[in-house]
Amino acid sequence: MSYINIIEKSENSIELELVNDDHSLSNALKESLLSKKGVVIASYGVEHPVLHPETGRYISNPTLVLKTEGVLAEKVLKEALRDIIDLCSNCLEEL
């Protein structure tokens, strides 16, 4: 299971680590953030992944960097996460 480790946080920037993730949440979150007004930078990096012995998935701890201007970084991050949840909910309803 993934969880978030906040590395650094200020009003206009957040750097966080998504523990035991791959590109799935990291990329979706980056794309959602880039669509938001006031986002200056939304990017993530992934170290070389390792094979998880229980799941057989390649995992890593991607680091996401968000920088904003004129809007609180935490607020934009929460909006982007809600957008991803809404997208998944809509997909489930259509099945």
Swiss-Prot record:
It comes from the Archaea. HAMAP family: RNApol_arch_Rpo11. It is found in: Cytoplasm. Belongs to the archaeal Rpo11/eukaryotic RPB11/RPC19 RNA polymerase subunit family. GO terms for cellular component: cytoplasm; DNA-directed RNA polymerase complex. CDD domains: RNAP_L. The gene is rpo11. It catalyses: RNA(n) + a ribonucleoside 5'-triphosphate = RNA(n+1) + diphosphate. Its EC number is 2.7.7.6. Keywords: Cytoplasm, DNA-directed RNA polymerase, Nucleotidyltransferase, Transcription, Transferase. This is DNA-directed RNA polymerase subunit Rpo11. Signal peptide: none annotated. Part of the RNA polymerase complex. One of its GO terms (biological process) is DNA-templated transcription. One of its GO terms (molecular function) is protein dimerization activity. Transmembrane segments: none annotated. DNA-dependent RNA polymerase (RNAP) catalyzes the transcription of DNA into RNA using the four ribonucleoside triphosphates as substrates.
